[in-house]
């Protein structure tokens, strides 16, 4: 099973938690929990991998809500009992090529 498939399973079974930072970001940026779930469950892909991240391995996922809104979700690897959602934001097209590659 691929990394994104393992993450999708954790999300489907609601085995995830939001960090305080991710909660704050989602409120400020008007991103709902349902949108984050949609973005992971739908056509999503790991676009950056951070195996040596400061607080443990994590990755950046690009996904789209049911309404087509692109979201970036940084989360821990699925090896933890609960995936930690570290950051959530709508990528700025001025900073990203196709929301996948940093300019």
Model-derived features: positions:
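Ribonuclease/tRNase effector modules and their secretory precursors
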Residues: 1-103
């Amino acid at each position: 099973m691929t990394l994104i498939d393992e993450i999708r399973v954790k999300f489907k079974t609601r085995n995830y938690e939001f960090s305080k930072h991710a909660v704050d970001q989602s409120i400020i940026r008007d991103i709902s929990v349902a949108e984050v779930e949609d973005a992971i469950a739908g056509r999503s892909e790991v676009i950056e991998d951070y195996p040596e991240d400061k607080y443990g391995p994590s990755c950046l996922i690009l996904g789209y809500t049911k309404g087509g809104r692109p979201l970036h979700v940084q989360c821990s690897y699925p090896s933890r009992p609960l995936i930690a959602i570290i950051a959530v934001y709508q990528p700025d097209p001025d900073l990203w090529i196709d929301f996948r590659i940093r300019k």
